[in-house]
Amino acid sequence: MGQKTLQGLVAAAALAASVANAQQPGTFTPEVHPTLPTWKCTTSGGCVQQDTSVVLDWNYRWFHTEDGSKSCITSSGVDRTLCPDEATCAKNCFVEGVNYTSSGVETSGSSLTLRQFFKGSDGAINSVSPRVYLLGGDGNYVVLKLLGQELSFDVDVSSLPCGENAALYLSEMDATGGRNEYNTGGAEYGSGYCDAQCPVQNWNNGTLNTGRVGSCCNEMDILEANSKAEAFTPHPCIGNSCDKSGCGFNAYARGYHNYWAPGGTLDTSRPFTMITRFVTDDGTTSGKLARIERVYVQDGKKVPSAAPGGDVITADGCTSAQPYGGLSGMGDALGRGMVLALSIWNDASGYMNWLDAGSNGPCSDTEGNPSNILANHPDAHVVLSNIRWGDIGSTVDTGDGDNNGGGPNPSSTTTATATTTSSGPAEPTQTHYGQCGGKGWTGPTRCETPYTCKYQNDWYSQCL
């Protein structure tokens, strides 16, 4: 992950101008955020382009004394001589701007490329593993309120081998990044990170973390993937108690071994569109989260889901999360609003086995060793583009091939022969809260008893 920055831990009387004066000519890098346009959509008004960019995480940056002669960070954390307390640290230390290209971050139009490695001018290849956040034109993080809404984007994971993790997720971070009198940079310098793993960082919500507490908050993993395996997972929290494991959906782990794969049902050797819907019990943006639904589009057509009835996470299938607020707690966080984080990383300790090895994917236990990745895949990167969010059915035209009725069973091919265990009607039915209609929809239009198909908008009807 990266490592430089510019403004930041400056006392209230030493705002932006003082930071500029503190820089020695030619030794500091200005903070220039790469532009990344996104779109907010409604069924009535279409999609409106947003003034957005990305910002590299605060923890990846260079913190230094005024003349740049000494780092304020040591191998064991913050230098306690320079930073015995927040006010003193703000007087002594500055946070530097970054070169985004050498940090593994590139944008072009609406596309964001995140690279695991960067080759320097000396020929050395370094692991940079960047993490960035979506930043608004006002200098604060964009807060996405996605309860009863959907988020879509295009993604290309074709260059990502076993052991890599391209992640796009939501974190309930403070919109300002914890901006305060001692941290005037805030979100503009990527501060305030938190997630359900409760990482212990040098700063907690923009404030010097003298107590070494974990930075805990609700986390919704929309995408954690390489070309071999993928999972989407809610991680709700109650206070500082979080569901760290989560109750995710991984097609391979559920037995659908040729779904997410190069040449698979969803061909990960080519780009595709991913849509995640946060469906409520009453179809509104103020209801209770009942279902997290995943939809894929490739070549202009909707890809059949891995599981019959759809690739979904429901409260009934997420009982392990109940002590942490459950799916409804995740919905509450989505309703309050969350910040979009995007990253690429690998795992030197566990080789990302939890994602793509054993019962979770086709990779061997050692294939994900970062040294193997560097030797064989130095160009490992992910491309994320065309990020849109808004009303369900408003962000992507799924085309005439729209079909949420589900694909074949894990290790079998579809046949016309009825199974001996079938007890339902011949006509396929949709489950509670599932989609049952909309433009281009060719999946089930009949709901299971006692539910009925209720119109929500031209693109989406729901079993309620």
From Swiss-Prot:
How activity varies with temperature is described as: Optimum temperature is 60 degrees Celsius.
Q: Does the keyword Hydrolase apply?
A: yes
GO BP terms in the entry: cellulose catabolic process
Q: Which residues are glycosylated?
A: N99, N205
- InterPro entries per the UniProt record, alphabetical: CBD_sf, Cellulose-bd_dom_fun, ConA-like_dom_sf, Glyco_hydro_7, Glyco_hydro_7_sf
Question: EC number(s) per UniProt?
Answer: 3.2.1.4
Q: Where is the signal peptide?
A: 1-22
What Gene Ontology cellular component terms go with this record? extracellular region
Quote the SMART domains the UniProt record gives.
fCBD
User: What is the annotated localization of this protein?
Assistant: Secreted
Tell me about pH and activity: Optimum pH is 5.0.
Keywords noted in UniProt = Carbohydrate metabolism, Cellulose degradation, Disulfide bond, Glycoprotein, Glycosidase, Hydrolase, Polysaccharide degradation, Secreted, Signal
What reaction does this catalyse? Endohydrolysis of (1->4)-beta-D-glucosidic linkages in cellulose, lichenin and cereal beta-D-glucans
Disulfide feature: C41-C47, C83-C89, C162-C363, C194-C217, C198-C216, C237-C242
- Comp. bias (Low complexity): 409-426
Q: Give the annotated active site.
A: E219 (nucleophile), E224 (proton donor)
Protein task: Endoglucanase that is involved in the biological conversion of cellulose to glucose. Hydrolyzes internal beta-1,4-glucosidic bonds. Shows relatively high activity toward barley beta-glucan and carboxymethyl cellulose (CMC), and lower activity toward lichenan, wheat arabinoxylan and other xylans.
Family, according to the entry, reads as follows:
Belongs to the glycosyl hydrolase 7 (cellulase C) family.
PANTHER family with a match to the protein in the record: 1,4-BETA-D-GLUCAN CELLOBIOHYDROLASE B (PTHR33753), ENDO-BETA-1,4-GLUCANASE CELB (PTHR33753:SF1)
Q: What else is known?
A: The biological conversion of cellulose to glucose generally requires three types of hydrolytic enzymes: (1) Endoglucanases which cut internal beta-1,4-glucosidic bonds; (2) Exocellobiohydrolases that cut the disaccharide cellobiose from the non-reducing end of the cellulose polymer chain; (3) Beta-1,4-glucosidases which hydrolyze the cellobiose and other short cello-oligosaccharides to glucose.
Report quaternary structure and partners. Monomer.
- What is the protein's given name? Endoglucanase 7a
User: What species does this protein belong to?
Assistant: Thermothelomyces thermophilus (strain ATCC 42464 / BCRC 31852 / DSM 1799) (Sporotrichum thermophile)
